[in-house]
Amino acid sequence: MDSHNSAPPQIAEVRMDISSSTSVAAGNKVCRGAACDFSDSSNSSKDARERMASMRKLIIAVILCIIFMAVEVVGGIKANSLAILTDAAHLLSDVAAFAISLFSLWAAGWEATPQQSYGFFRIEILGALVSIQLIWLLAGILVYEAIVRLINESGEVQGSLMFAVSAFGLFVNIIMAVLLGHDHGHGHGHGHGHGHSHDHDHGGSDHDHHHHEDQEHGHVHHHEDGHGNSITVNLHHHPGTGHHHHDAEEPLLKSDAGCDSTQSGAKDAKKARRNINVHSAYLHVLGDSIQSIGVMIGGAIIWYKPEWKIIDLICTLIFSVIVLFTTIKMLRNILEVLMESTPREIDATSLENGLRDMDGVVAVHELHIWAITVGKVLLACHVTITQDADADQMLDKVIGYIKSEYNISHVTIQIERE
């Protein structure tokens, strides 16, 4: 609980059970409206707004793709241009990929279940993976068709129509790139620190699990919001075991005002983040734009010299390879999430050293940092403190450091005595 916050705890329900045979006391306090970003995603207004904004962009992109695809199919047939037809096929894969992304965003809002305690956020990762595989499959088909046409001479190509259709395609792709790329991937530092949802974190719901061990050897679960309001408390006392364990799970419920002003500075340092499905769609559009430019250049050359129709096939080969390379980074990010690697924007060594440099901290071990999906990072570790250190104060310092410096939304800390 913050020292500057004098607001009394607000407790909606208290249950206490005492067993004389086991000398164990258990109590539960549940805060009104407490919701976990991972366990109950449908109650997270921040994630809901993120999904809705992303879905609107993808729906507009699908409509534009369908319109332009129809234009390219007609224009490609009339111009006898494989490059235009393959671009139309690429747009078809875009439509399918966007549809997968839309489904992924919708499914990510499903309420968590006992089996899926973190919700369905990772469906977004799987949807983006399928989307990328569609690009690779189509690129392989296009390369094969281009090679066949190189071996077997194709008919005449109308360079003027090829140029006009690809120019129109470039215009449509620019519109979609602006739409999908302007996803507020930059961090904002609002002084009030309340949660915004433009695909960048502003301190929405944070979750902490705290574990203390001291000489009394009890077991405590404590939930507390950002204003000092108790969320959940379970107290178990085990005499004779010589072990005190404090476990706290703490969603920090931010209101629209009155949040800790010291957190606003940390918001300025947050890494850029955008929804992975919107970013995947952006890569699709980027590949289409590059291909449209190539087709425009090829069309202009063929328009000027019709006998150089082989350029149509060369464009198909070159830009199919470029499209493949545009997906490498996204695929790497997807695999890192699925492999539960430490996110690249977080320096685990620096974080660990920062904890060890704190007064009262003896050692840090069992440090694990991973992500459920892009932008939703989790951390768990054991922190050993000196005998004379106050466990609660040390816990607050550790949690505050991790949140302010690294913006990790779900933290589990176990405090141990040396």
From Swiss-Prot:
Transmembrane feature ranges: 57-77, 90-110, 123-143, 161-181, 283-303, 308-328
GO cellular component: plant-type vacuole; plasma membrane; vacuolar membrane; vacuole
One Pfam match: Cation_efflux
Major place of residence: membrane
Cytoplasmic compartment residues: 1-56, 111-122, 182-282, 329-418
Topology in the lipid bilayer: Multi-pass membrane protein
An annotated GO BP: zinc ion transmembrane transport
Region of interest (Required for zinc-binding), ranges: 182-246
Topological region Vacuolar: 78-89, 144-160, 304-307
Keywords from the named record: Ion transport, Membrane, Transmembrane, Transmembrane helix, Transport, Vacuole, Zinc, Zinc transport
Zinc as UniProt keyword: yes
Region (Disordered): 186-248
Molecular function, one GO term: zinc ion transmembrane transporter activity
Biased composition (Basic and acidic residues): 196-227
Superkingdom field: Eukaryota
Amino acid composition bias (Basic residues), ranges on this chain: 235-245
Annotated localization: Vacuole membrane
Record function comment: Involved in sequestration of excess zinc in the cytoplasm into vacuoles to maintain zinc homeostasis.
NCBIfam families per UniProt: CDF (TIGR01297)
Family under the similarity heading: Belongs to the cation diffusion facilitator (CDF) transporter (TC 2.A.4) family. SLC30A subfamily.
Name by which UniProt lists this protein: Metal tolerance protein 1
Taxonomic source organism: Oryza sativa subsp. japonica
Classification lineage: Eukaryota, Viridiplantae, Streptophyta, Embryophyta, Tracheophyta
Gene name, Swiss-Prot/TrEMBL: MTP1
